[in-house]
Every structure is written in structure tokens, then in C-alpha cells.
Design a protein with these regions (language model features):
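Metal-dependent de-N-acetylase/amidase catalytic core
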Residues: 1-15, 102-106, 110-302
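Active-site rim/loop-helix segments in enzyme catalytic domains that contact anionic ligands
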Residues: 1-133, 160, 282-285, 290
């Protein structure tokens, strides 16, 4: 494989791969805003348009624009969120697969993102990697963060792009080869973070929004006293608490998808800064030397 990463390090560039508009705001947005403020170029690739999303904000139920054109509404929301975060943004152009429900589960809709052959689904992302030339790619884990079919496919295309964009024999016609240096999985739903916030809230005499989630994790643990061990441990924590309000504003920009009185806003930004001022990641592969644990996704590159 040909590698260009050592040929050009400045400016540093990061690419985050997400399934739907709004995912970038709920997973890693404070980290991205922090890096943007320090001069890093940050790009978000959104695999689908979120056309099959439901309205999650009670205040917008029955909104005629969203009901008539959910895809159009979410494009406007994504543009607003990108502006708030200061990031660059690229749609990859696939159709939302929706979240199947029922027993048995219904078939996914024809031609949706999750049913695309991998080489077709990954090609636009490989093209973007070769054009944007990121040093770091941030992706979901094998479970997609949670098992939505589009999240699982977003994981697959991100890993495929990381492994093939530097090979000029792969994906011909998508631009000159570029080999990213590091691949991370996002750990937005880190049980350690939820536990720390939960107990801090209890100690302060405040209601915790994490009680049910923690109870569910405890039920799945064979020992019954600690959360299940993650397949991908935290290797890297980014101190970005100063950007939690920016994160929250980006979330609110996705008005159809986010309840402003809901789970994401149940704990104040100052409390989160005090207890857990980081966003958490797991280093999956590095083509540059680095030492764990890290406090910088670009460790080994500067």
C-alpha cells in the first residue's frame, strides 16, 4: 500500500463517518468543535439523508414541512448543525433504511443503504477520503453504536475506506490514493461515563436519567455487580468540556429528531464538565507510533 500520510501533516484533518443527520451532534460533536477551534480541519460524512426518521420532538408533531418532506427538513437541520460546529460536511447520497420493528422484523426497503453491496456503499467514502485526505477517521463499532442497520453499514464502509483508500489498485476512478494514519471507534455511550454521572447526581440529591440504562447493563452482566466489559476499551479521552454547550446547540439544530426537554439535556453542561469533561474513543488501528492512553486523536502525528 502506498502511504501519503507522512508527506503532509499540516493542517491536521479528521473525518467522522455517521449514518444519519443528527448522529454527528450526539456522538463526538464537542470533540470536533474543540479541534476546529485549534485549527484542525474536520469533515463529517453523512451516509444517508435520514428520510425515514420519525419526529422525536413533541413540539413538532404534525409539522407540515417535516411531514411532507422529512429529508428536506433534515438537510436544513444538518446545515445549521454544521455551521454551529464549524465543520465541513459531505452527504454520501444513500437512502435511509429505517429502523425495522416487529416480530418477525419486516424486510428492509429496496435500494436502501443497508442493502447495498459493500463496494458500492464504500465508494463515495473512499472518494471523499482521497479528496479530503484525513489523518484520522472516527467511526462506529461493529454494533453501530446501537444495532440500527444504517449504523452497522456506516461502520463497514468506514473500515473499508480506512483499509483501502491508500491502495491505488482499489476503487479506481475515485482519486489519488491516500492512507489515513489512525482509526478510532466512538464510545459515546460509555458505561463508565454514565455511571460516574449517575452517582454524582445521586450524591447531589438530583434525579438521574441513567438509572434505567445502568440497570439494563447490570442485568446483562453474569457477575451482576459491574457493567459488561466493552469489547473496545477506552484508549483516548479528549478534554472538550468547554464545548458541551456547542454540542447541545448542534443537537437542538436537529429539531425534528431531538426533544429539547429529553435525555440529552437532562444533566447540565456544568455538571458534566465537573464529573466527565471528556469524550471517549477506542484506538483500533494506528499506522504511526503512539503510546496509550492518549489525550489527543492526533497523538503520533504531532
Amino acid at each position: 500500500m502506498s502511504s501519503n500520510v507522512s508527506q503532509e501533516v499540516e493542517p491536521l484533518r479528521l473525518l467522522a463517518v455517521h449514518a444519519h443527520p443528527d448522529d454527528e451532534a450526539s456522538k463526538g460533536s464537542a470533540m470536533m468543535a474543540s479541534y476546529v477551534s485549534s485549527g484542525v480541519e474536520v469533515m463529517v460524512a453523512t451516509c444517508t439523508g435520514g428520510e425515514r426518521g420519525d419526529i422525536q420532538n413533541p413540539a413538532l408533531v404534525g409539522d407540515p414541512h417535516s411531514a411532507r418532506d422529512m429529508g428536506g427538513a433534515r438537510r436544513l437541520e444538518m446545515a445549521n448543525a454544521a455551521k454551529i460546529l464549524g465543520i465541513q460536511h459531505q452527504w454520501l447520497g444513500f437512502t435511509d433504511s429505517g429502523l425495522p420493528e416487529g416480530d418477525p422484523l419486516p424486510e428492509l426497503p429496496a435500494n436502501c443503504f443497508a442493502l447495498k453491496p459493500l463496494e458500492i456503499a464504500a465508494a463515495p467514502l473512499v472518494r471523499l477520503v482521497r479528496r479530503f485526505r484525513p489523518h484520522v477517521i472516527v467511526a462506529y463499532d461493529e454494533n453501530g453504536g446501537y444495532p440500527h442497520p444504517d449504523h452497522i453499514m456506516a461502520h463497514k464502509v468506514a473500515v473499508e475506506a480506512f483499509h483501502t483508500a491508500g491502495d491505488p489498485q482499489k476503487y479506481p476512478g475515485t482519486g489519488p490514493a491516500w492512507e489515513p494514519a489512525k482509526l478510532y471507534y466512538d464510545l459515546a455511550f460509555n458505561p463508565q461515563r454514565f455511571r460516574a454521572l449517575h452517582f454524582a447526581l445521586e450524591e447531589a440529591g438530583l434525579a438521574s436519567p441513567y438509572a434505567e440504562r445502568l440497570a439494563a447493563w447490570l442485568e446483562t452482566d453474569t457477575e451482576g455487580h459491574t457493567p459488561p466489559v466493552s469489547k473496545h476499551p477506552t484508549t483516548t479521552q479528549i478534554d472538550c468540556g468547554d464545548y458541551f454547550e456547542t454540542r447541545d446547540n448542534a443537537l437542538r439544530a436537529h429539531a425534528t429528531q431531538v426533544d429539547p426537554d429529553g435525555f440529552f439535556f437532562a444533566v447540565s453542561a456544568p455538571m458534566q464538565r465537573k464529573v466527565w469533561p471528556w469524550e471517549d474513543y477506542s484506538l483500533i488501528e494506528s499506522r504511526v507510533p503512539t503510546t496509550l492512553p492518549e489525550n489527543d486523536l492526533f497523538a503520533g502525528l504531532r
